[in-house]
């Protein structure tokens, strides 16, 4: 199997070395000579074309966004943005997704052994996902211990054959990963102000989901916000799961709400789509509509099958419109998807099902 060639671009020597060590620990990844700025990176790319670039957001001489635009206009290559958790850094990294970047990762930093191991898994997975991305024109607006692949059982036990509480109010749950930020923009922009309530898990690091939600809120007719514990799930509003926390759909009487909780990685992710979908199967049952969008891996596939078994209607994005046809494909293969449709028709279908 051909190794994924990665070019690291960061002005910090410490970050360059740390990233190189992390990526080199994966037998499927080959690290090219790193670059301290975009000008050196351009020289490296003339010598050897990388499969993936990890790009610092803030650098002297030329910032990451400017270099990203040049890459995408001249020689499109999958780019993973690497950012700190500052407010400006988060906003810029999210903006980069509109210019063609396919993933965001948090810069590695010192922490507990568990934190460092989870960071290693996330960074390597982001690069692998990026290497599979099918780039298209964006319209702006081993030997190592690996994280165990836990199921949603560690957060919420399997639902029974029926939802715990019978309801009539429809609720929509959505899961996405690589390429999902653009897919979610297309989906949410098409919804009217009084759309059904929506809860979303988009794989994204802690600190970036708020900026992502704010950007969507500024361009959509519905309200979009980062979910907080006990937020009411209501019409005309989409809640986006915060990074690094699991988000569950719950119901108390006539009210849907979200529970935000800690816990181990599930299907190698936190937040996990499987956790959200399982909670929807239990608490909404046949009144839920599940949507799984572009992304690498299989997070959400098992949960979507549980939703369908509980009577929910489930939708998978089709291969032609996915950046990475991993998660939807797994859901289809496991019998979790009722229907497979193009991205630009999902909003219309959701509205029809909830009408």
Swiss-Prot record:
InterPro entries for the chain: CheB-like, CheB_C, CheY-like_superfamily, Sig_transdc_resp-reg_Me-estase, Sig_transdc_resp-reg_receiver
Residue span(s) of domain CheB-type methylesterase: 165-355
Function field: Involved in chemotaxis. Part of a chemotaxis signal transduction system that modulates chemotaxis in response to various stimuli. Catalyzes the demethylation of specific methylglutamate residues introduced into the chemoreceptors (methyl-accepting chemotaxis proteins or MCP) by CheR. Also mediates the irreversible deamidation of specific glutamine residues to glutamic acid.
EC number: 3.1.1.61, 3.5.1.44
Any Pfam family: Response_reg
UniProt keyword list: Chemotaxis, Cytoplasm, Hydrolase, Phosphoprotein
Single GO MF descriptor: phosphorelay response regulator activity
Reaction(s) the record says it catalyses: [protein]-L-glutamate 5-O-methyl ester + H2O = L-glutamyl-[protein] + methanol + H(+); L-glutaminyl-[protein] + H2O = L-glutamyl-[protein] + NH4(+)
HAMAP family given in the database record: CheB_chemtxs
Protein name: Protein-glutamate methylesterase/protein-glutamine glutaminase 3
PTM field: Phosphorylated by CheA. Phosphorylation of the N-terminal regulatory domain activates the methylesterase activity.
GO cellular component terms, semicolon-separated: cytoplasm
Gene3D superfamilies according to UniProt: 3.40.50.2300, Methylesterase CheB, C-terminal domain
Annotated Response regulatory domain residues: 5-122
Coiled coil stretches, renumbered: none
Modified residues (4-aspartylphosphate): 56
Signal peptide: none
Active site: residue positions: 177, 203, 299
UniProt keyword annotation of Transmembrane present: no
Domain comment quoted from the record: Contains a C-terminal catalytic domain, and an N-terminal region which modulates catalytic activity.
Keyword RNA-binding listed: no
């Amino acid at each position: 199997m051909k190794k994924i060639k990665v070019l690291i671009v960061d002005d910090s020597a410490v970050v360059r070395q740390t990233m190189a060590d992390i990526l080199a620990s994966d037998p499927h990844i080959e690290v090219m000579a790193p670059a301290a700025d975009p000008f050196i990176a351009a020289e490296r790319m003339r010598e050897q074309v990388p499969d993936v670039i990890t790009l610092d957001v803030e650098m002297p001489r030329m910032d990451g966004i400017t270099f990203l635009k040049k890459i995408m206009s001249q020689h499109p290559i999958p780019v993973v943005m690497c950012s700190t958790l500052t407010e400006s850094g988060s906003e810029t990294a999210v903006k980069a997704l509109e210019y063609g970047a396919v993933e965001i990762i948090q810069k590695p930093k010192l922490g507990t052994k568990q934190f460092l191991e989870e960071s290693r898994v996330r960074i390597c997975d982001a690069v692998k996902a990026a290497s599979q991305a099918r780039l298209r024109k964006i319209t702006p607006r081993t030997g190592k211990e690996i994280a165990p692949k836990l199921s949603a059982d560690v957060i919420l036990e399997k639902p029974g054959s029926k939802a715990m509480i019978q309801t009539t109010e429809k609720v929509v749950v959505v899961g996405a990963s690589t390429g999902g930020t653009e897919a979610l923009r297309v989906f949410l922009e098409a919804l009217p102000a009084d759309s059904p309530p929506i809860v979303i898990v988009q794989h994204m690091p802690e600190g970036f989901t708020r900026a992502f939600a704010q950007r969507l809120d500024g361009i959509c007719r519905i309200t979009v916000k980062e979910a907080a514990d006990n937020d009411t799930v209501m019409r005309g509003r989409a809640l986006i799961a915060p990074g690094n926390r699991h988000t569950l759909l719950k119901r108390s009487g006539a009210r849907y709400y979200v529970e935000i909780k800690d816990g181990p990685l599930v299907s190698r992710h936190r937040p996990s789509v499987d956790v959200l979908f399982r909670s929807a199967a239990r608490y909404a049952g046949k009144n839920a509509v599940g949507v799984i969008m572009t992304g690498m891996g299989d997070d959400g596939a098992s949960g979507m099958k549980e939703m369908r078994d509980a009577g929910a209607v489930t939708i998978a994005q089709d291969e032609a419109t996915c950046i990475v046809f991993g998660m939807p494909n797994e859901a289809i293969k496991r019998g979790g998807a009722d229907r497979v449709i193009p991205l630009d028709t999902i909003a219309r279908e959701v509205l029809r099902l909830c009408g």
